[in-house]
């Protein structure tokens, strides 16, 4: 059963400007593993914007926004084919587990100007 959906869109230029002003903000939003993915990417601003948007979309699918947990409690990894995989930790995981067995489906896309993410929280 679908418990929640979330969508978020962001201008890539906003992310690029944030990176140019203070790259350290990445350490506040992303786990070490996510930062390793970022460092391997050629189009860093697009990649970061997509992942930022994904975390926002997942928080909306949980039905809470970022209440009771931080950005780092939602990690976006990828499988061998590059499909985004959501890993919930801390408060985000507690919220999802409160619904029972769960799975988060996620899609991320971008063009040169915007990144968008769509998340679906399924409970069983």
Curated annotation (Swiss-Prot):
GO terms for cellular component: cytoplasm. Its cofactor is Mg(2+). Gene3D superfamilies: 4'-phosphopantetheinyl transferase domain. It is found in: Cytoplasm. It comes from the Bacteria. Its main location: cytoplasm. Pfam families: ACPS. Coiled coil: none annotated. This is Holo-[acyl-carrier-protein] synthase. The lineage of its organism: Bacteria, Bacillati, Bacillota, Clostridia, Eubacteriales. The gene is acpS.
């Amino acid at each position: 059963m679908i418990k929640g959906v979330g969508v978020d869109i962001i201008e890539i230029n906003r992310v690029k400007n944030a990176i140019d002003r203070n790259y350290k903000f990445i350490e506040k939003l992303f786990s070490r593993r996510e930062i390793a993915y970022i460092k391997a990417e050629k189009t860093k601003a697009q990649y970061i914007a997509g992942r930022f948007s994904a975390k926002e979309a997942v928080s909306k699918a949980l039905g809470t926004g970022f209440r009771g947990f931080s950005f780092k409690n939602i990690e976006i990894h990828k499988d061998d084919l590059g499909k985004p995989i959501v890993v919930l930790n801390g408060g985000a995981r507690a919220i999802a587990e409160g619904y029972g067995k769960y799975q988060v489906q996620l899609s991320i896309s971008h063009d040169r100007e915007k990144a968008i993410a769509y998340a679906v929280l399924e409970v069983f």
